[in-house]
Amino acid sequence: MSTSTVPPDGGEKVVVVGGNDWHEVVAAARAGAAAQAGERIVVNMGPQHPSTHGVLRLILEIEGEIITEARCGIGYLHTGIEKNLEYRNWTQGVTFVTRMDYLSPFFNETAYCLGVEKLLGITDDIPERASVIRVMLMELNRISSHLVALATGGMELGAMSAMFYGFREREEILRVFESITGLRMNHAYIRPGGLAADLPDDAITQVRRLVEILPKRLKDLEDLLNENYIWKARTVGVGYLDLTGCMALGITGPILRSTGLPHDLRKAQPYCGYENYEFDVITDDRCDSYGRYIIRVKEMHESVKIVEQCLARLKPGPVMISDKKLAWPADLKLGPDGLGNSPEHIAKIMGRSMEGLIHHFKLVTEGIRVPPGQVYVAVESPRGELGVHMVSDGGTRPYRVHYRDPSFTNLQAVAATCEGGMVADAIAAVASIDPVMGGVDR
């Protein structure tokens, strides 16, 4: 026999079980679930939604305006890049990985190339000029990525001016990228052993102009939002995630640093000579969306400082390793053919050196051979730790390449930052996570 009672304070119904009455217990449980079903609603936000930063699907269970459960649905942008890498040589792989996190392509390329170079044992042989240019491009890319995060986040919360300002400054940076690499995005400019080509003649002038105008432009963006009453009302205390939650979920990047922990791989595990640059690791202790916004704004100023140091350190020299078994036998200057082959090089391999022609053909078609082994390398992308686990079986193609994309890992924070808050606050919380679905789904 079972009896049900309701406490005097009007709390949940209590079912007391006396034995041999399982069907009554089940009936009471079903009745309770049915009563709650009328109050709770499951809502799909996305995958086609302007505020989900791509094809992200949020399954929200709501009770009134309060989110009681939040889950992510991913996979809508799966492209099979990691599998495709197993069917391309080590150099061709760069053209695939640059398309993953499409807002920070230089970080994808650098992480991949650092892994290949570590397997080859040539990490310390990379020309100084190539490393400095890598750092310069990554920091400009960090600024452009953060500008998109602030612009889209502002648009979603109604700050349209922030969107116009953010995309205006990003456009200036993309013009420089196009001048240097030939493409605004998906550059495939960083290659194992160095770079695809040296900087064009006017690149330094363009970058200098950029670092002159960016501080004032970024200050304009700060003036719009830092003390904006509506902006603070929508972000302060919203999307709260403390240090314990970040460590439990493996969260990195601005979200982790917004808890006060100064973890940045550029300082903790330097690569590309970052130990030679002076910059601060920006932290905040608010643990909320506003703190992450402040971190991204201040990080852009630090990136400008690093780019200025890169310009000062940039000395003439090669941009590709000198080992002819690894580097294409060309000077890699952009020639009239548009493919990076100078007339002098073409004349040499076509007319005066049959061995050079054969070697060039094998390097381009078959690719370099990488010793067997496995490595893990990581860089500090705009979203956190971007890691690459790379396995070689001694052939001309990777046996396996796996990316630890920070967007994928950080999406685990959706439930922790959204549950218990308002539906409208989920927009601000996801915007502060700044996921890029190209990196999540790969």
Swiss-Prot record:
The keyword Ligase does not apply. GO terms for cellular component: plasma membrane. The keyword Hydrolase does not apply. Its main location: membrane. Transmembrane segments: none annotated. It is a peripheral membrane protein. It comes from the Bacteria. It is an enzyme of class 7 (translocase). Keywords: Cell membrane, Membrane, NAD, Quinone, Translocase, Transport. It is found in: Cell membrane. It catalyses: a quinone + NADH + 5 H(+)(in) = a quinol + NAD(+) + 4 H(+)(out). One of its GO terms (molecular function) is quinone binding. Its EC number is 7.1.1.-. NDH-1 is composed of 14 different subunits. Subunits NuoB, C, D, E, F, and G constitute the peripheral sector of the complex. NDH-1 shuttles electrons from NADH, via FMN and iron-sulfur (Fe-S) centers, to quinones in the respiratory chain. The immediate electron acceptor for the enzyme in this species is believed to be a menaquinone. Couples the redox reaction to proton translocation (for every two electrons transferred, four hydrogen ions are translocated across the cytoplasmic membrane), and thus conserves the redox energy in a proton gradient. Belongs to the complex I 49 kDa subunit family. This is NADH-quinone oxidoreductase subunit D. The lineage of its organism: Bacteria, Bacillati, Actinomycetota, Actinomycetes, Mycobacteriales. The gene is nuoD.
